[in-house]
Amino acid sequence: MQIILLDKVVNLGNLGQIVKVKDGYARNFLIPTGRARRATEAAKAEFEAKRAELEKTAATNLAQAQAQGEKLAGTAIKLTQKAGVDGRLFGSVTNHDIAEELNKQGFKLAKSRIRLPNGPIKMVGDNTVSVVLHTDVVVEVIVSVYGETA
């Protein structure tokens, strides 16, 4: 299926590109989330009429993400979990825990924006976590996990 991208999509293309994707990907994900439209002649003409407006919104979204990224860059989070003597946690620290702590500090982030490179954190210590604010803005945050013994 031929579609027109209304937003930048990772590994697919940028705003305004006409790309061919599998029908299910277009019907079930791209079109319902508002990232694409079917590439009919009418849709192409309508897109060209709204192109400047869409590019302006994309630019403002990127600027907002960059501004939030500058505030978030270098932020350190301290979390405490119950841990054994050897430093292993009873349970783990997940992206939900990190998002909750960042929200307490005033950053409005969904847990889906936080990427844990090695899965949930299961050891005491410092870990680097990626926060994806936009497809072009990725910020590193340091998460310090401290163990508390009961």
Curated annotation (Swiss-Prot):
One of its GO terms (biological process) is translation. Pfam families: Ribosomal_L9_C, Ribosomal_L9_N. GO terms for cellular component: ribonucleoprotein complex; ribosome. Coiled coil: none annotated. InterPro entries: Ribosomal_bL9 (IPR000244), Ribosomal_bL9/RNase_H1_N (IPR009027), Ribosomal_bL9_bac/chp (IPR020594), Ribosomal_bL9_C (IPR020069), Ribosomal_bL9_C_sf (IPR036791), Ribosomal_bL9_N (IPR020070), Ribosomal_bL9_N_sf (IPR036935). Keywords: Ribonucleoprotein, Ribosomal protein, RNA-binding, rRNA-binding. The keyword Mitochondrion does not apply. It comes from the Bacteria. The keyword Electron transport does not apply. One of its GO terms (molecular function) is structural constituent of ribosome. Belongs to the bacterial ribosomal protein bL9 family. Binds to the 23S rRNA. NCBIfam families: L9. PANTHER family: 50S RIBOSOMAL PROTEIN L9. This is Large ribosomal subunit protein bL9. It comes from Verminephrobacter eiseniae (strain EF01-2). The gene is rplI.
